[in-house]
Amino acid sequence: MEDCNGEDIIATPELPLEIIVYIQSFLQASDRKDASLVCRSWYYASQDFHFQKNLTFSFPASASSLELIKGLGRKSRCSLIIKQLDGFSMSRSLLMEVGLCLGSKLESLALPGSSITEASLLSLLPRLTSLRRLDLRGLDSLFMSGAFLSREEHRHQVRSALSGLEELDLSDLRYLSDLTFNRLTSCTPGLRRLSLAGCHIAFEFDPYRGCPAGAVKDSSALLSLRNLKRLVTEQRWTLVALDLSRTSITPDSLRTVAQVPDLVLEELRLHGCKELTDYSIEVLVKHQPSLQRLDISACTELTSRSVEAVAQGLKALTQLSLSRDWRITEKGLAELLSVSSLRSLDLSECLHVSGTEIVKGLTGCTTARAQLDTLSLKSCTYIRDFAVFSLTQLLGNTLRELDLTLCVNVTDLSVRAIATYLQGLVVLRLGLCKEITDWGLLGMVEATKCEPDQETADKGPRFTRTFGNMGFFKPPRLPFDEKPKLVTHNDLQQFKQQAGASLLALNRLQELDLSACPKLTDSSITQVLRYPDLRRLSLSMLPEITDASLASVACHCRSLTSLALSHCPGISDRGVAQAAPYLHRLQHLYLSGCSNITDRSLFLLLQHCDRLQTLDISSCKNISPTTVDLLQSRLPFLENVHHKFIETRSCYRKK
């Protein structure tokens, strides 16, 4: 081949498809989609089987979704989340298209926030022959009449299609009854996971008939314990996960379920079941010793006796949630942390936990102790620096997620310990830790920390000019009233030269929450927040940060999909103008209470952030409703726009 000058052109060889697939394996799904537009080879690579498994497409019901569904028909398999379906013709056409194009390829279907008719779903389900997961949570419109699947021919069609269904979510169904439950579950003989969270289940008493629950066979008004036990007994060989959260299950009812012969549960969720007692947990542990994941959060009657029972009886436990179990103390936690299989522990809002027994349990036998990768101590106000320092050393090799939100006694010492020992962290939450300052994030020690403060030095009593209060002396200044000591230019130069443990060391972070840490300023945010893989960042309620922080974060954290800057008075259009060109991946943006944000920022988002799904501009009084409407009409993926209190000014003008 020759060019216009008669010289030979050497053709550049194409990369092998396997190499392109390997390159794309390092990209996020959204970036891989953009890369597929480069050329045909890159498109074929993006369709590789490894990228298609566990792929879920989420979109609202609209006319434009019809073309999307037709395009998905070329994939070998996929999962769908379709929102806001109703009983009108467009939604019916959408479901029909799903059945025609994806019937044999669809693995999972969820219909949140929808109100569809029985006829629409019954025309779809017989076509979904490969379905493994069905989510019908909150679809009261299906069960209100009680006629769903009442005809034998419909049940036969659905049973033929759903014989391989493994997961069924029936959470928050107000009108679920014995009749409708039996009809539906008779079509799904091989269930592995069942969720009935938030359903109205009569465990002991039938309020409609004034008799014990289950006395009336196949009630058309409510779902009874007798019927639930029947299902668990019939499918005991396959059922491994059960969710009864937010129900009124009693200790006797839990024992009835746990004692079903040959039932071997691996996961049980009982969040918010406030009738449960320590005795019921002891019985559960005795009859279901193979449990690996247990959620007994917000069961407010439970005490440390339950913790001891779990520690002694569940030796295969990997995940445990005790969140909001307010009566739990330190007792039993040391023994719990000796369960070597434990990987995730949630103690958030356990107000009596100080961390002492956790440290004690982890410092026991090194061969038989928990290797935690997730630890939540949110709102454990007794947690102090010593506990955090010890935990970071003991869990340094395994911990990937740490939540210290509202641990008000945590200071810069804890931040430095985290930066030193937990360099594999992926998620770090420090929101509302009000004692954290720039010095902690920078990994430096404040120069004047050990010197007596002139303001607080004892100079004897000082009188005030106001004699009408309780006394004559000036009250001591409260710690949270003090302005943080500013980091100077010389301090920053020292930071750049030293090899101290700053938050920069956490270069694997994907989520960081520093909201409501009021002593943080631009000095640390601009120097430390430089994470190429960071996805979610919250800097809300930081009164000292300005546009400089926003611009720096956008420049150095270009993978951000969620950014929260609510109630940051120093953020303005100028910062958005500097940041928006770097935030192409942004999907969720929170700017409520940022009074210096105007219409100009919305036009910048329209220009640069076309993937935006959620926008919160509540109380941004310099934004006009007209611009909000324009933004909603132009951004194809924008689903949620919160704009309370922005019409105030225009309303006054009309008056």
Regions found by a protein language model. Give the residues of each.
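Alpha-helix termini
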Residues: 153-159, 230-233, 262, 364-369, ...
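Acidic, serine/threonine- and proline-enriched intrinsically disordered linkers and terminal tails
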Residues: 202-222, 443-506
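Tandem repeat domain/solenoid detector
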Residues: 251-252, 266, 278-282, 286, ...
